[in-house]
Amino acid sequence: MRGAILATAAALAGTAMADVAHMRRHGHDSFHQRRSPLAEADATCGCTTEVVTVWGPPTLIPVASPTPSTVTSEAVTTLHSTSTTTVTVIASASTPAASPSPATDKVPLPTPAITNFPSTGVYTIPATTVTVFDTTTVCGATTTELPAGTHTYGGVTTVVETATTVVCPYATVEPSGTTVTSVIKTTTYVCPSAGTYTIAPTTTTVPTSTVIVYPTPAVITPGTYTQPEQTVTVTRTDYTYVCPFTGQDEPTSAPAAPSTTAVPATTTAAPETTTAAPDTTTAVPSTSSAAPSSSSTAPASTGAVSGQMGMTYTPYTKGGDCKDKSSVLSEVAALKSKGFTHVRVYSTDCNSLEYIGEAARTSGLQMIIGVFISSTGVSGAQDQVTAISKWAQWDLVSLIVVGNEAIQNGYCDASTLAGFISSAKSAFQAAGYTGKVTTTEPINVWQAHGSTLCGVCDIVGANIHPFFNADVSADQAGKFVAQEIKVLESICPGKDVLNLETGWPHAGNANGKAVPGTSEQAIAIKSIADEVGSKSVFFSYFDDLWKEPGQFGVERYWGCFDTFN
């Protein structure tokens, strides 16, 4: 038996070893061959098996029941003990603890305060005074009321004379947690051809009339700025109010010139960003305010005489390109034959100073020259201040106008404009200019911000367009302008008033009693010239066919040169 067991064990071992080797050679085939090999037919076995059977009655074998055992459990309780040791440390007097460095406070700047009133009522905004020591470029804020619908607003408007690429700074907002933050960013814009382009505007859709607040670049110059206490009566829910600072306490010395933040064009032909002649669609509200009579006359330095004082001139073709020198010389010279004594120029682009200056000198005209502030703000206009200072033909200049409806258009606030006028005046005076400097805005802006502007303006400059008052017909245009001038005389007591832009369109759509047309234009122009011609600059020499039609479709059709005999 032992031999059989050993033989059987040996056979199984051999089969297992063979299976392992087979599995290594053929893998899955070994799973079908796990059995002992058959013995050969003629082999003999050396073992004999005997079976012994015993017969007898069945016997029950009792199974003993297990003896139950008793298990005793013991409760175990674990006790936790905590010991505390108190150590008192006395600091040495020779090693005092270092005091933390005080945090640097941010210098407050007179940016407009924006307040949202969720419900109707009367609210009081407390007064605030801020003193600024350094010139700083910041994101200001402006508002515009949009009627229901889709509108595009803001952005930077630039005029280029040829295809070019410009690198342009613009103001925008970025999300910051649950709010938004106004920032100045820069973009590269390809202008495919000559023309006027608006870069990075914002488009929005409003379901109802809504006041939109959006950022604009602004330069804060040194000085003391006051935000007076304001009482606001809110007549509708969710109303947004912008409370600007005013520079009532101007610095005794001239503030530093604002830093220029505009990035120049990336091509050698850098585009002018301030070449667009102003639109005239600003509605001038009528007023019934009683104004004291004034005996002041036009300033002697302007050379104003009876009849018509001046006319605006922009050196652009019908397509918006720059005119050649010969055209400018002949057209400006013709103003003298019409009885004008002044020509008003808005900007320095298209060689305006050189060409118009030469024509003015030859013809015996005086110039009212301008620094045009566009949507780039005052920083984008600094180059014009430099250009005028270098040109410096002051014997031709009777007045410099810094900005044309810049506040009305939302390009800067009153305090920013006042600071820029002050710094520009200093630059002109340093270059030898001894004449007068002002700005020009509609009457409503002067009424709202006269306290800020009067101190830096030598005269009150206003754009008075009777056509945009729906109750004024062409034959009443002169009386309307005269009434507005009287109101303006009361805003800056002791300072003269000039109507720096006025006229009447000869085509377009009616605005109530104000009807455009060739005959209506002639009637309105004569009415204005008869009433206040010696204090008025007429708009404009030619039609500006390169403009958009604008409100009432009249923006292109203000040319009135041929109306004068």
From Swiss-Prot:
GO terms for molecular function: glucan endo-1,3-beta-D-glucosidase activity. It catalyses: Hydrolysis of terminal, non-reducing beta-D-glucosyl residues with release of beta-D-glucose. GO terms for cellular component: cell surface; extracellular region; fungal-type cell wall. The keyword Signal applies. The keyword Secreted applies. Its main location: secreted. It is an enzyme of class 3 (hydrolase). Keywords: Carbohydrate metabolism, Cell wall, Cellulose degradation, Glycosidase, Hydrolase, Polysaccharide degradation, Secreted, Signal. It is found in: Secreted, Cell wall. Pathway: Glycan metabolism; cellulose degradation. Residues 1-18 form the signal peptide. Residues 246-304 are annotated as: Disordered. The active site is at 405 (proton donor), 501 (nucleophile). Residues 251-304 have a biased composition (Low complexity). Its EC number is 3.2.1.21. One of its GO terms (biological process) is cell wall organization. Belongs to the glycosyl hydrolase 17 family. Beta-glucosidases are one of a number of cellulolytic enzymes involved in the degradation of cellulosic biomass. Catalyzes the last step releasing glucose from the inhibitory cellobiose. This is Probable beta-glucosidase btgE. It comes from Aspergillus fumigatus (strain ATCC MYA-4609 / CBS 101355 / FGSC A1100 / Af293) (Neosartorya fumigata). The lineage of its organism: Eukaryota, Fungi, Dikarya, Ascomycota, Pezizomycotina.
